């Protein structure tokens, strides 16, 4: 099969290559990204879903997707494609921002809980020095209660008893200073 050959100079002079827009592969990647975003939205809890700015049609599609949930079902896959198609005709930037806020909130909560666990370990292992440092940062804590929990947790550890005071200390710290971390 022979085609019409044009001299290379014609391609260099014309700007026809620039007017073509995104490639077919790029359009497919964009569609798959929107479909994955739709899957993330469908998997959110109801309270998180309320924070996502969805118009009525997209919200109905997401609710239906939540009902179709079985991931091995072909209808669920097709419905995710439908959600992606709906999102292609909308400004998805507010949706992306809301999703990132939700994701960051989860990581922030995990970091706070991890810091509480570190404080608990330091209190049990270092004793009064860690307690004094904690009290200097958080004045509202009950020093006597913390000392009692530290002593009890150390005794439980020595006697190989269940870590009741260990857990109680974590709950106390979480209740008193979680919002301040």
From Swiss-Prot:
Classification via SUPFAM superfamilies: PSPTO4464-like (SSF158710)
Chain intervals for the UniProt region annotation (Disordered): 1-24
Compartment(s) where it occurs, according to its Swiss-Prot or TrEMBL record: Cytoplasm
Main localization, broad class: cytoplasm
MF terms (GO), sorted A to Z: ribosome binding; rRNA binding
Record GO cellular component, one term: cytosol
Gene3D superfamilies listed in its UniProt record: PSPTO4464-like domains
GO terms under biological process: assembly of large subunit precursor of preribosome
CDD domains in UniProt: YjgA-like (cd16331)
Swiss-Prot/TrEMBL keywords: Cytoplasm, Ribosome biogenesis, RNA-binding, rRNA-binding
Family: Belongs to the DarP family.
Described function: Member of a network of 50S ribosomal subunit biogenesis factors which assembles along the 30S-50S interface, preventing incorrect 23S rRNA structures from forming. Promotes peptidyl transferase center (PTC) maturation.
Entry protein name: Dual-action ribosomal maturation protein DarP
């Amino acid at each position: 099969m022979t085609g019409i050959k044009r001299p290379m100079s014609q391609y260099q002079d014309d700007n026809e290559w620039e007017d073509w827009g995104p490639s077919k592969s790029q359009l497919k990647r964009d569609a798959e990204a929107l479909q994955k975003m739709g899957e993330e939205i469908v998997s959110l809890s109801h309270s998180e879903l309320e924070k996502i700015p969805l118009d009525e049609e997209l919200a109905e599609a997401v609710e239906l997707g939540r009902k179709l949930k079985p991931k091995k079902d072909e209808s669920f896959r097709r419905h995710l494609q439908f959600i992606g198609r709906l999102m292609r005709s909308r400004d998805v930037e507010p949706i992306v921002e809301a999703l990132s806020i939700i994701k960051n909130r989860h990581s922030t909560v995990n970091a706070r809980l991890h810091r509480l666990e570190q404080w608990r370990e330091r209190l049990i292992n270092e004793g009064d020095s860690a307690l004094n440092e904690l009290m200097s940062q958080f004045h509202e804590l009950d020093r006597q209660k913390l000392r009692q929990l530290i002593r009890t947790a150390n005794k439980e550890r020595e006697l190989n008893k269940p870590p009741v005071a260990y857990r109680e200390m974590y709950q106390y710290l979480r209740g008193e200073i979680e919002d301040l971390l």
